[in-house]
């Protein structure tokens, strides 16, 4: 090896050594922040930050050189708060310093003096935010963190630590118990805290010349005026309920209250049953998002009134169990009891399903703490590595950003977007399914009274880029805690929901139609709840540049046919184009579309889950990125006969929507329809469970007559609306009657795929078997009275829990009817085109065996009243009026609404419909 080669290698090694040295500061900071966030997530019941050094304490050892080892921690409060002689709340705390190998606990005096020379030398690397909080809960100690290694999770969980207990000097001038502090360990460019007064300034290092030696360090300077104001500075209260062993999630929602509106913050402590109500005028009102608004336990309470800039309350909530109580007796459930249990079974469907931008940025390099504006020198920690990322990220955000506002902005990221920029940042292997969870990140910039902290040049363009959050992948992203890197305080919570789409950590801002990013100087709020805000649209050319890796080769050509792109899919299981397979590989053998969850529909909708599948179509739950709403998408089979049938359905649905714009007729509304990959797709409003599932959650025991009456009145209202327009639904059944809400009795009719106008009958084989009228079975002419027959069968099933006529085929179905109602009139048999199948030549029914017992059915041997045992004569008469052999003798929808059994609820339940 020549000397030239050796020189090149030596030079290369020197460059690497210098690079490692320059990167050590940021690397240590990132490790400290990650471990701090992980420990906060895993074990800290109550993490209370250390108070900023508002008053320096006396220390005569200014010239002693000490090796200060500090950690990036949020120190838990060990002992209860004690009231000082001046009325300030002072916590007991101890600062442990290491001089060589010897540890010396130092307890500073509680007396404050304006002429105090310095805070202890061991505060050299301590930087603290100017916020204060108080807490009384005892938590485990945190382990120290050395920059060269990361302790295993077990040490964090057990709370064992090799380092001493950290206590801070008490001071009577301190107005609050503690404040958040963040320090780095063994960093070459320590962050110093300088306090200036009329008598001079003192540095918190072992030598007053440390600031000169460490030219790259960030210095936070305080004047006497700022220190006096800091005594009255607003407190940042963080109240955490203890986590249970099952790692319950936290819930924080941002209220829509006006600025500076008084907010009552309730803190519940499940350990000691104490509650404290803190009434503060808040700049950003953050309220608790609970399942129910319940008052705090009345055992003990304390009220504190404090002027605050921002009050953040984080409360642990336990999501309701999705299991319902099992009834062992066939007793009818009361209405209130049913919907109370349903409230635990199913939560509102539209909850957000996506991680916030800050959560996505947790996987990239976090920007270092920013310098004060008074310091003209840029910090060495604010290096070009973070600026390169921030500049790229900001350029992408520009296309979706609104006009910057000087106060606050809301950034909404919709469910599991592959969205448009963070997919370049976050690895797909980090994608986790977080069904029924939504993450809300609230980032609040706290201003110092003397001078406000400015973001670094790379991250000043966007508040999102300036504050990154760190999430614990080891916990499979079930809990996400956000850690502030600059002079911002970030709070991240996870809210449980039940019907949310599965979350993916690969996010993008631009693919969310409601995402708005603005530069904010005071408050930036990032939430995942879908809202109806203005959407962001990108062109196919931009989508190809940003997401070409997320698109298949066929999609890269297909996307050019769609002028507006909202979503490109968030899955690596996309269907591949194959010209040798049916519909180029997008369909199965019978013409059904191959549904892939998390994929897109027409570059606008995200497929969340499959709701149902029938002989004509598939129904999926999707998220509309244009409107920010959850919708139901009906994907028709790729066959001509189904296509023609769907065109008739569209014609009827649009006619109904035109005649019922306010949806008073309890009929589902069609939102839109379009073609995608040779499939006709219809979009509808998303409703709750159908009545069959409603019976299923009650273990098919049926419901009381009051609830049955409510359903009956609403169905009659819909049938009257259809009857006036000569429309036959032709497929009434419990599966096609959906609850509007899982906790209320409002319903809507769906599925008009078999419907027709009365004078334009298309099909002869209609209606589901259990609810099929005799004229359809016998092949005679039918009219809108077939829906009345179906109504009678449905109401009996809701009451009893089982079908009234459960035939396995048409002969058995007709035999079941004749067993209860007797033989049909001769006129009905004579008009039948299929009488040879069911009757002998003399008109007697052919024998039919019970498919379950094997016994022959007999005619008229089963009493109707004995079959249902309702005990309500009006109900029995109403059902019998619906189940007449002759269609002309059946009750009409108009007459049904005036029936004695229905009239009791017609006023509140059946609103007037358009004429």
Curated annotation (Swiss-Prot):
It is an enzyme of class 2 (transferase). Residues 605-902 form the Protein kinase domain. SUPFAM superfamilies: Protein kinase-like (PK-like) (SSF56112). It catalyses: L-seryl-[protein] + ATP = O-phospho-L-seryl-[protein] + ADP + H(+); L-threonyl-[protein] + ATP = O-phospho-L-threonyl-[protein] + ADP + H(+); L-tyrosyl-[protein] + ATP = O-phospho-L-tyrosyl-[protein] + ADP + H(+). It comes from Dictyostelium discoideum (Social amoeba). It comes from the Eukaryota. Signal peptide: none annotated. This is Probable serine/threonine-protein kinase dyrk2. Pfam families: Pkinase. The active site is at 731 (proton acceptor). The gene is dyrk2. GO terms for molecular function: ATP binding; protein serine kinase activity; protein serine/threonine kinase activity; protein serine/threonine/tyrosine kinase activity; protein tyrosine kinase activity. The keyword Protein transport does not apply. PROSITE patterns: PROTEIN_KINASE_DOM, PROTEIN_KINASE_ST. One of its GO terms (cellular component) is cytoskeleton. CDD domains: PKc_DYRK. PANTHER family: DUAL SPECIFICITY PROTEIN KINASE, DUAL SPECIFICITY TYROSINE-PHOSPHORYLATION-REGULATED KINASE 4.
């Amino acid at each position: 090896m020549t000397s030239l080669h050796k020189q090149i290698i030596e030079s290369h090694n020197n460059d690497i050594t210098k690079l490692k040295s320059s990167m050590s500061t940021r690397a240590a900071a990132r490790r400290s922040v990650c471990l701090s966030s992980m420990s906060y997530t895993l074990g800290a019941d109550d993490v209370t930050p250390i108070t900023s050094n508002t008053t320096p304490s006396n220390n005569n050892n200014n010239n002693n050189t000490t090796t200060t080892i500090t950690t990036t921690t949020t120190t838990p409060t060990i002992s209860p708060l004690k009231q000082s002689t001046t009325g300030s709340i002072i916590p007991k705390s101890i600062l442990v310093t290491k001089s060589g190998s010897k540890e010396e606990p130092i307890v500073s005096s509680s007396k404050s003096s304006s002429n105090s020379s310095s805070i202890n030398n061991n505060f050299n690397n301590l930087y603290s935010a100017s916020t204060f909080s108080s807490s009384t809960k005892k938590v485990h100690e945190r382990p120290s963190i050395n920059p060269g290694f990361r302790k295993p999770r077990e040490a964090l969980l057990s709370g064992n630590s090799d380092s001493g207990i950290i206590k801070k000097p008490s001071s009577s001038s301190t107005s609050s118990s503690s404040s958040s502090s963040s320090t780095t360990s063994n960093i070459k460019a320590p962050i110093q805290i300088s306090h200036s007064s009329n008598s001079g300034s003192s540095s918190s290092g072992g030598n007053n010349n440390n600031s000169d030696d460490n030219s790259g360090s960030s210095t936070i300077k305080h004047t006497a005026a700022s220190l006096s104001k800091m005594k009255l500075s607003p407190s940042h209260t963080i109240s955490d309920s203890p986590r249970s062993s099952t790692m319950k999630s936290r819930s924080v929602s941002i209220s829509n209250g006006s600025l500076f509106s008084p907010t009552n913050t309730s803190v519940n402590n499940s350990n000691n049953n104490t509650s404290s109500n803190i009434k503060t005028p808040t700049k950003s009102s953050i309220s608790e998002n609970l399942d129910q608004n319940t008052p705090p336990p009345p055992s003990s309470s304390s009220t504190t009134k404090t002027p605050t800039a921002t009050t953040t309350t984080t409360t642990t909530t336990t999501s309701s169990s999705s299991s319902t109580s099992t009834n062992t007796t066939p007793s009818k459930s009361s209405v209130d009891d049913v919907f109370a249990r349903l409230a635990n079974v199913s939560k509102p469907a539209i909850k957000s399903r996506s991680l916030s931008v800050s959560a996505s940025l947790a996987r990239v390099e976090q920007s270092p703490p920013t310098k004060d504006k008074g310091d003209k020198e840029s910090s060495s920690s604010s290096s070009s590595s973070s600026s390169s990322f921030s500049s790229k990220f900001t350029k992408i955000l520009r296309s979706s950003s609104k006009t910057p506002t000087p106060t606050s902005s809301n950034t909404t990221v919709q469910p599991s977007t592959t969205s448009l920029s963070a997919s370049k940042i976050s690895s797909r292997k980090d994608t986790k399914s977080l069904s029924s969870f939504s993450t809300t990140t609230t980032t609040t910039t706290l201003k110092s009274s003397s001078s406000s902290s400015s973001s670094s040049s790379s991250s000043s363009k966007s508040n999102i880029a300036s504050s990154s959050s760190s999430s614990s992948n080891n916990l499979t992203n079930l809990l996400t805690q956000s850690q502030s890197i600059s002079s911002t305080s970030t709070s991240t919570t996870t809210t449980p929901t039940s019907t949310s789409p599965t979350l993916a950590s690969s996010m993008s801002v631009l693919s969310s139609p409601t995402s708005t990013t603005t530069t904010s100087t005071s408050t930036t709020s990032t939430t995942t709840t879908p809202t109806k805000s203005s959407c962001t649209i990108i062109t196919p050319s931009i989508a190809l540049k940003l997401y070409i890796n997320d698109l298949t080769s066929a999609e890269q050509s297909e996307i050019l046919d769609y002028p507006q792109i909202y979503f490109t899919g968030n899955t690596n299981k996309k269907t591949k184009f194959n010209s040798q397979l049916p519909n180029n590989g997008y369909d199965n053998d019978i013409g059904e579309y191959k549904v892939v969850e998390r994929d897109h529909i027409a570059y606008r909708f995200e497929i969340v889950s499959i709701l149902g599948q029938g002989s004509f179509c598939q129904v999926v739950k999707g998220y509309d990125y244009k409107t920010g709403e959850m919708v139901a998408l009906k994907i028709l089979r790729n066959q001509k006969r189904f296509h023609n049938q769907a065109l008739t359905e569209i014609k009827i649905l649009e006619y109904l929507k035109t005649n019922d714009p306010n949806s008073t007729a309890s009929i589902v509304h069609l939102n839109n329809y379009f073609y995608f990959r040779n499939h006709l797709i219809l979009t509808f409003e998303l409703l709750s469970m159908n009545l069959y599932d409603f019976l299923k959650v009650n273990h098919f025991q049926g419901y009381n007559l009051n609830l049955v009456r409510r359903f009956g009145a609403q169905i009659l209202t819909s049938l009257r609306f259809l009857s006036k327009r000569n429309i036959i639904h032709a497929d009434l059944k419990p599966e096609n009657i959906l609850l509007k809400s899982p906790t209320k009795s409002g319903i809507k009719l769906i599925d008009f795929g078999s419907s027709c106008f009365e004078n334009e009958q298309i099909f002869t084989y209609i209606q589901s078997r259990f609810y099929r009228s005799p004229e359809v079975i016998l092949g005679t002419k039918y009219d809108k009275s077939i829906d009345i027959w179906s109504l009678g069968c449905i109401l009996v099933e809701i009451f009893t829990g089982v079908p009234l006529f459960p035939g396995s085929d048409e002969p058995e179905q007709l035999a079941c009817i004749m067993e209860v109602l007797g033989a049909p009139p001769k006129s009905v048999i004579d008009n039948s085109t299929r009488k040879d199948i069911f009757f002998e030549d003399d008109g007697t029914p052919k024998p039919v065996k019970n498919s379950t017992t094997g016994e022959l059915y007999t005619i008229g041997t089963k009493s109707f009243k004995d079959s249902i045992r309702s005990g309500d004569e009006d109900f029995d008469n109403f059902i019998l009026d619906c189940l007449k052999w002759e269609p002309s003798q059946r009750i009409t929808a108009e007459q049904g609404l005036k029936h004695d059994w229905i009239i009791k609820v017609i006023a509140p339940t059946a609103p007037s419909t358009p004429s």
